[in-house]
Amino acid sequence: MSQRKRYSLNVVTSPSIPSPTPSAPIRTNESNWEAASPASAASSFLPNVHHGGTVLNPGLGIMRSPSLNKSGAFGRSGSSGSSTVIEPSNIKLLLIGDANVGKTAMILSYCRELLTRAEMSRSVRLRHQQQQQHKDLGLKKTVVNHRLSMKEKRKRYSSNDFEKEFKDINHFADETSDFGNPNIGDDNNHEMADPNEIVIETRSTIGIDIKTNLVNIDNRFFNVILWDTAGQERYQNAIIPSLYKKTNAVILTYDITNAKSFQSCMERWIVQALENFSSQDLLKARFFLVGNKIDLYKERQVTHYDVVQMVQEMQLKHGIKISGNFEVSCKWVNVVERTMNMIILDLVENGCFENNDPCVSITISDDVQGHEQEFHDTVEEPFNFTRQRQHQLEKNNTVDITKPNDDIANNQSICCV
């Protein structure tokens, strides 16, 4: 028996080295939105188009507004290192205003559900192809059934009868193929159109429409609930009492090309909000003024001076402070999204949200409230006034041998030990 040499398979493996952790902080400015890698740990504001839920992509955050003291990441979703499941806090945004001012379009633009002209053309073409397949299938079934029925009748036909029959079938097929074709008569209309232009096709809201988005601010999750209300009065009477419950932000929406919708914010909508707000919910609510359709600036009927006047009038007449006023356009990319992000950040910084995290408390203690009230009572200067605390200097009992003693001036004896 021949001796065979046995070999062992020893694979030299390198010791496990932990992956380095980047020490440099993540910058949250506009310059690295496009340069961010998809595998970044921070969150992004660029979700996929969702149908019934929120599908999110990782990425970098955005820069905070200049009024905020801290800088941090802001994203739609993110992954935390902790395995503990923490329920996100709720932020309720209520959009109110007249009909046809663009409340629904603003929400769809924030949720990235508005299609461009090229995307809509592809969608219409795909839908037409599906309809054409169903029609062709139905036509084939009709022809087959007709042939079967012809066989059952066992009737002999002349060549003229068959020619007439096939002409009728071809005529029916041409009519069904031309019906609903999106390319007929539209080539000349869309020849010069921009394929990246956002197409806004919305219907009037009946009752309310609710959409949600999950955002991540400084590794803390917030469930943003956007309430789209009907501008017509006949759809509101039944839902007004429960509409303003636990609302954190009231967004007064108007059309800059319609002065009547702007006046309704002052005469109708702010009055309705104050009548239906409870005293407890009003403490955690903030008001914002948003003008839509700024892309139609040539047809503007509401000027910036009118907006400033209304803000001052609301504060004097109703005692309501407008926390911010914006002008947006749903046809411009990311304009509505940046505006909504600034509103959400303002609410979080001021504690205007429903806190579902038991580990974090936003309740202000009595001592802090007392010191804050004392500060506002004593200081009559604006916010740039700096108050310094002065300490009373007490005489030290120890002797400093490097400095002359005060008792020298009194001609007293000094003894240094």
Swiss-Prot record:
NCBIfam families linked: small_GTP
Subcellular location: Endoplasmic reticulum membrane; Bud tip; Bud neck
PANTHER family: RAS-RELATED PROTEIN RAB
Keyword set includes Cytoplasm: no
Gene3D superfamilies named among the record's database cross-references: P-loop containing nucleotide triphosphate hydrolases
Keyword set, alphabetical order: Endoplasmic reticulum, GTP-binding, Lipoprotein, Membrane, Nucleotide-binding, Prenylation
InterPro entries referenced in this protein's UniProt entry, alphabetically: P-loop_NTPase, Rab, Small_GTP-bd, Small_GTPase
Protein name, UniProt field: GTP-binding protein YPT11
Binding residues annotated for GTP, in chain numbering: 97-104, 228-232, 292-295
Superkingdom of source: Eukaryota
Function of the protein: Involved in the positive control of both endoplasmic reticulum (ER) and mitochondrion inheritance during cell divison. Required for the MYO2-dependent retention of newly inherited mitochondria at the bud tip in developing daughter cells.
Membrane topology: Lipid-anchor
Lipid anchor positions (S-geranylgeranyl cysteine): C415, C416
Region (Disordered): 1-34
CC per GO annotation: cellular bud neck; cellular bud tip; endoplasmic reticulum membrane
Gene Ontology MF terms in the entry: GTP binding; GTPase activity
